[in-house]
Amino acid sequence: KHVSVCYNNVSIYEKGGFKMKVVVAIDSFKGSLSSMEAGQAIAEGVKRVYQSAEVVVRPLADGGEGTVEALVEGMGGIFVTKEVTGPLGAKVEAVYGVIESKEDSSKTAIIEMSAAAGITLVPEESRNPMNTTTYGVGELILDAIEKGCRHFIVGIGGSATNDGGVGMLQALGYDFVTQEGKAISYGGNGLRELARIEEANVHPSLKECTFKVACDVTNPLCGENGSSAIFGPQKGATPEMVQELDQLLLHYAELSKEINANADRFYPGTGAAGGMGFAFLTYTNATLESGIQIVLTETKLEELIATADFVVTGEGRLDGQTALGKAPIGVAALAKKYQKKVLAFAGAVTPDAKECN
C-alpha cells in the first residue's frame, strides 16, 4: 500500500509497517478558531488519509493575546474568572489560567496583563496614562498565589498603562507613599505624589514565586526610546504628558534602588508595557523572555519535533511579518534544527510570505 500527498514538491507518505508521526502546532485564527481548534481540525484531516498516523497537537501562541487560551486548552488546565480593578479603577472580570504539573503537582498561572489593564478596556475618549493603573494585574497574581501557584507566565502586551507597574506592586503589598505617608493614587498622577517605597507589607509568598514574562521589545524604561516616548502616545499621552511621565518614571527608578540596588532602568525590556518589565525585574524573581520561546518551552515542543516525521504550523495570516519572529517561525526554526519538513496552513497568504522559507 502506498498513499502519497504532495504539496510544493514535498511528499508525505505511508507504506506498510511505517507509522508516520505528525506534530501540529498552529497559532489561532483570530475570530474563527483557537489554536487547539485549528490543530484538531488539521489532525482530523491527516487521520482521514493516514489512519495509522500518530498526530500530536500542541497549542501555539506568541505570549500575547490568546496565550492563556492556548496553553490552558492544550495542557489540560483550568480557567479562573476573577473580578479585579480595571485600568480606570472600575471593577472588571478577568480570566487567567492555572495548569497543574503532572510530574510534581506544582501549579503554574498563565496571565495576560491585558485582561486586567488592557487598552481595549478603556474607551478611546478616556485613554490617559495619567489615570490608568495596573492594580488589577497584581490582584490576579494574588488570587493565583492564594490558589497555590508559585510559577507564573505573564504576557504583558496590549496595555493601557504607563505607571511603571506600580499599581501591580501596590496590590502585591508594596507601599508607595506620599511625603505624609499616605498611599499614592493610581496611574501617572500617583507617580507625581511618590516620595518613598516600603516593603514591610509585601505578600509573604511572593518571594517563593518565579515569573516568566513574555516580552518581545527591548526598550529601556526612560529616555527617547523609553516607555513613555515610544508607547505613551498610543495610550493617549500628549507630548507634554510624555515628557512628564518620563521624568516621573526616572524618579521611580531611582527610588527603587533603595529596595533593589540592582534596579536598572536601562536594561532592555524594562520599558515594555508602560514599565511593567522594570517592575517585574526589580521587585520579583522574574526573567524577560521571548513570548514564543516561553510557549515552545512550556509545551515541550522541541522534544516532539525531534522525533517527528512531519511538522505542521500556521496562523490566520501568513505574510512578511510572520518571518520577523511570530509563532509559526519559532516552530519552523525548531523543525529546521532537526531537518524536518514543515507545512504551513493559513487563512490568507500574501506574496511576501515567501520570506518565511
Label for each model-derived stretch:
Residues 3-5, 10:
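Short hydrophobic alpha-helical segments enriched in small aliphatic residues
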